[in-house]
Amino acid sequence: MSGPSSPSSTGHWDSTTTKPPQFAPRSHNDVYPFILPKRFRGALKDKVTIITGSAGTIGQALAECFAVAGAKLVLTYNNTPPPTTLKERCVNLGASDVSFVKCNVAELKGCEDLVKQVLQTQGKVDILINNAGANSLGLFDTQPPEAFIHELAVNLHGPYYLMRLLLPHFKSQHSGCVLNIASRAGTVAIPYSTGYCASKAALINLTACVQKELDVDKLNDVHLYSLHPGGIKSVMTLTSQILPLLNLHPPPSTHSAFTQAFDTLYDDSPYLNGMTCVALATGLAKHVLRGKYVDVGQDLEDILAQAEAIKSDENLYALHTSFLGGLENGGTGAGEKPGDGLKKSAEAEGGKEGFEFPGF
């Protein structure tokens, strides 16, 4: 890709600028050439891959995509088993093995039993995909606390449990990949979806924090990612059906905005997320995107072409906060060092440095 704002053919930029140039990656709502299944056929041969929430639209697509890559699939479900045809489809696509395990990821005991069973039967785990999710929707002040807590348990506690249980294994084998299916809801505020937004935001930051610890230990072959899987139509996103069932009656303008955002804009293929996850699991982007939050709608090839731009800006593909006046997240203003304001105040008053009750 070329253009006035694209990186040069050498991958360098003008040294007089403070940051490398950027260009907008191409956007997709379906599988595109860089992540075509045929490019990754057998790329994850015999890699033991746990996929939670495998019964849903996103989970089944993940299973099929990793099957093409030759993975050994451990597909978990809680209340609803995956369709009986899923195993046959995955085997026909190239999966080394397919097994189904009932597991409630919201409970630590269930996660412990799952990890123990997989390690005993398969001898290892190579890839963990935390895909199970819950979104009960509802007004914050009337939603039953049990529903809010359940969303946190499934969306955050489950991934935490499984990551916590498997990280020692990944460290001992010096390899492993975690793909946490988050959501754009983790980076924006959406009414009637408080528990979902809060838990997905926490999941994004959990991923980044754990990767930082792994990087300190120079375990570069243990790589984690959080992802927005795209706008995929599912029971969770068809608000035109859900809002009335939940007895939610927002103002007409709000209802209209929700209907358009969820029912019209949700037109992405679940295989876009599936093949992006396969590509990331192979490690082709770990030097740039490990620990990062990735929107699968952006062209991965275009993202990787801007590795230096991403490495030079910690806010890219990460949660961050912006303040007026350039205030940094550490609490100091642009160009100031911690304590500068205190020192100036103390010097002006002719007193010693320190905080004193200001009086009234």
Language model features with spans:
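Conserved glycine-rich cofactor-binding loop
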Residues: V48, A55-G56
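Active-site helix of classical SDR
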Residues: M163, S199
